[in-house]
């Protein structure tokens, strides 16, 4: 009976260690994530510029709307990468982690926008601190695509 339990445990560990559907995604799918992230970076830069130049809430909101739209484009490219990598394995896991990080980052940008509009300096500083903390983590996950998605 012990042997059967041990064999079952080993078999279960092997099944978990060898993802059945994992596959290498096409380079174009991986590259699209990079393109969308570059565009997201430009959107972040536009928000930074708008924060110092906009005189109205509508002007500021316009730059945030563009940022959120590009954030959704990044999210869609990560979903495509996850699907193209067979929805399992190290590449799919990295894509899912990056997607979760992007969702969290976008929530922080929503908080930053709200705090800025309300002129709540402490809340804006807190949201900006979260963004500064999360950005390198997400960048590290995305950089792992170089090894995990080949």
Task: Kindly label every feature range from the protein language model.
Residues 1-7:
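Bacterial N-terminal signal peptides that target proteins for export
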Residues 7-17:
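Bacterial N-terminal signal peptides
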Residues 21-69, 145-150:
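Immediate post-signal-peptide N-terminus of mature secreted/exported proteins
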Residues 31, 58-69, 92-103, 121-136:
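Short, charged, amphipathic alpha-helical segments
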Residues 37-50, 74-81, 130-139:
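Short, intrinsically disordered, charge-biased short linear motifs at domain edges
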Residues 72-99, 145-150:
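Short, solvent-exposed, charged loop/turn and helix-capping segments
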Residues 105-108:
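Extended, amphipathic, non-transmembrane alpha-helical segments
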Residues 112, 116-123:
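Short helix-adjacent coil turns
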């Amino acid at each position: 009976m012990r042997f059967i339990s041990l064999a079952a445990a080993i078999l279960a560990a092997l099944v978990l260690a060898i993802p059945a559907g994992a596959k290498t995604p096409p380079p174009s799918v991986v590259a699209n994530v990079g393109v969308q992230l570059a565009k997201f970076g430009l959107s972040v830069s536009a928000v930074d510029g708008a924060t110092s130049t906009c005189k109205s809430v509508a002007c500021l909101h316009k730059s945030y709307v563009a940022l959120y739209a590009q954030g959704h484009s990044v999210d869609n490219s990560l979903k495509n990468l996850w699907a193209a990598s067979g929805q399992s394995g190290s590449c799919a896991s990295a894509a899912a982690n990056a997607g979760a990080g992007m969702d969290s980052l976008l929530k922080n940008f929503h908080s930053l926008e709200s705090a800025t509009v309300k002129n709540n300096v402490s809340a804006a500083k807190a949201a900006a601190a979260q963004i500064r903390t999360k950005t390198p983590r997400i960048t590290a996950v995305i950089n792992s695509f170089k090894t995990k998605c080949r």
